Swiss-Prot record:
Organism: Podospora anserina (strain S / ATCC MYA-4624 / DSM 980 / FGSC 10383)
Residues that, per the record, bind substrate: W218, W318, K346, E350
Family to which this protein belongs: Belongs to the glycosyl hydrolase 6 (cellulase B) family.
InterPro entries, A to Z: Beta_cellobiohydrolase (IPR016288), Beta_cellobiohydrolase_sf (IPR036434), Glyco_hydro_6_CS (IPR001524)
Protein name, as recorded: 1,4-beta-D-glucan cellobiohydrolase CEL6C
Keyword Hydrolase: yes
Function per UniProt: Exoglucanase that plays an important function in biomass degradation by catalyzing the hydrolysis of the non-reducing end beta-1,4-glucosidic linkages in cellulose and cellotetraose to release cellobiose. Hydrolyzes crystalline and amorphous cellulose but is inactive on hydroxyethyl cellulose, mannan, galactomannan, xyloglucan, arabinoxylan, arabinan, xylan, and pectin.
Reactions listed under catalytic activity: Hydrolysis of (1->4)-beta-D-glucosidic linkages in cellulose and cellotetraose, releasing cellobiose from the non-reducing ends of the chains
Alphabetically ordered keywords of this record: Carbohydrate metabolism, Cellulose degradation, Glycoprotein, Glycosidase, Hydrolase, Polysaccharide degradation, Secreted, Signal
Signal peptide as annotated in the record: 1-18
Length: 398
């Protein structure tokens, strides 16, 4: 998707989130799962200090059944298994993939929290091609009844399991920066209504919610900070200011550094228009705007693939960045009060989009010089890319 700063006409910032993964459903591992009694999360606190992010079996299965048997270098196996044991988020990115939730919940022990991404708005990812969704503009009722209501029903049936939700990556940030894109104008009402409905309906005692807020290279532009905070705050208030709402998720499926200083693009000609040159600064700066707008402002930050910097020709190049590596592992030790945790939201090894220019879902960002080529369709397993992430991991997994 394309994101532009109104203050810097030369700046073109983009991001996108991969489409559904073909991962098949698996039976939960036989282990002690859930707590003996109902979980009640206090969204006024950082729950990641109490719970460890769960390493879900869907991503584990991709690594154990797709990645490890096909490693070009057997010496990478130990590192691959470390990734399989690392907590990451389960993506509910189609109506059919809601079926992933029940077995995922059934495998979570009491001291862990299941990360779940809710990602199926009508007209999803309105400014990109690689990650368009199944629901068309105007199918909001299907989103509510077949997707969100089903998720809520399953979560209610598992009150003894802690869950952290990331709500609809890329949706509201697109409305802030891509109002000139007709598809985004068409999707706007459904995005706002759908996000508010998701927040209200999934406001459950065992759940803590974070809404997607793009990243520092998106809403971090000086001209985007205030309207961005106001857009997110409107959704929060339209949902009735849900008790289980904690704040924002940043850098989802992204590449931005946590605390690199000066930032990766600090020497660019338009850098003076963006004071948020890393995610740490963005969380602090945008957090102040969120507070002023009347919304909770704590954050989780996706560090799954940001281990290497200086790879992108432009800040907006989002697709399968060549040379990338796994980043900091999930941890509540961020050193910043507003940052609850580093988390792995995007499963490293699942493609961002195809580099085949003849494909229906081809996005030109996946054919950029700094994008890994060849690459398969969004969500498909990308073996060569996974191995590169292992080799370039920082801190090293080798």
């Amino acid at each position: 998707m394309k994101i532009t700063s109104s203050a810097a006409a030369l700046a073109l910032v983009a991001s996108a989130v991969a489409a559904p993964s073909p991962t098949t459903q698996d039976k939960p591992t036989k282990r002690q799962a859930g707590c003996a009694s109902a979980v009640s999360l206090n969204a006024q606190t950082n729950v990641f200090k109490q719970y460890t992010l769960h390493a879900n079996n869907f991503y584990r299965k991709e690594i154990e059944e797709l990645a490890i048997p096909n490693l070009s270098d057997p010496s990478l196996e130990a590192a691959a298994r470390k990734v399989a044991d690392t907590g990451s988020f389960v993506w509910l990115d189609t109506i059919a993939n809601v079926d992933r939730l029940e077995p995922a919940l059934a495998e979570v022990p009491c001291n862990e929290i299941l990360g779940v991404v809710v990602y199926d708005l009508p007209g999803r990812d309105c400014a990109a091609k690689a990650s368009n969704g199944e629901l068309k503009v105007g199918e909001l009722n299907r989103y509510k009844t077949e997707f969100i209501d089903r998720i809520a029903s399953i979560l209610k049936a598992h009150p003894n399991t802690a869950v952290a939700l990331v709500i609809e990556p890329d949706s509201l940030p697109n409305l802030v920066t891509n109002s000139d894109v007709q598809a985004c104008r068409n999707s706007a009402a459904g995005y706002r209504d759908g996000v508010a409905y998701a927040l209200k309906t999934l406001n459950l005692p065992n759940v803590v919610q974070y809404i997607d807020a793009g990243h520092g290279g998106w809403l971090g532009w000086d001209a985007n900070l205030k309207p961005g905070a106001e857009e997110l705050a409107k959704a929060y208030k339209a949902a009735g200011s849900p008790k289980q709402f904690r704040g924002i998720a940043t850098n989802v499926a992204g590449w931005n550094a946590w605390d690199l200083s000066p930032g990766e693009f600090s020497s660019a000609s338009d850098a003076k228009y963006n004071s948020c040159q890393n995610e740490r600064t963005y969380v602090n700066t945008f957090g102040q705007r969120l507070k002023a707008a009347g919304m909770p402002n704590h954050a989780i930050v996706d560090t799954g693939r940001n281990g290497v910097q200086g790879l992108r020709e432009e800040w907006g190049n989002w697709c399968n960045v060549d040379g990338a590596g796994f980043g900091r592992p999930p941890s509540a030790d961020t050193g910043l009060e507003l940052a609850d945790a580093f988390v792995w939201v995007k499963p490293g090894g699942e493609s961002d989009g195809t580099s085949d220019s003849s494909a229906v879902r081809y996005d030109s960002f996946c054919g950029k010089p700094d994008a890994f080529q060849p690459s398969p369709e969004a969500g498909a397993w990308h073996q060569e890319y996974f191995e590169m992430l292992l080799r370039n991991s920082n801190p090293s997994l080798l």
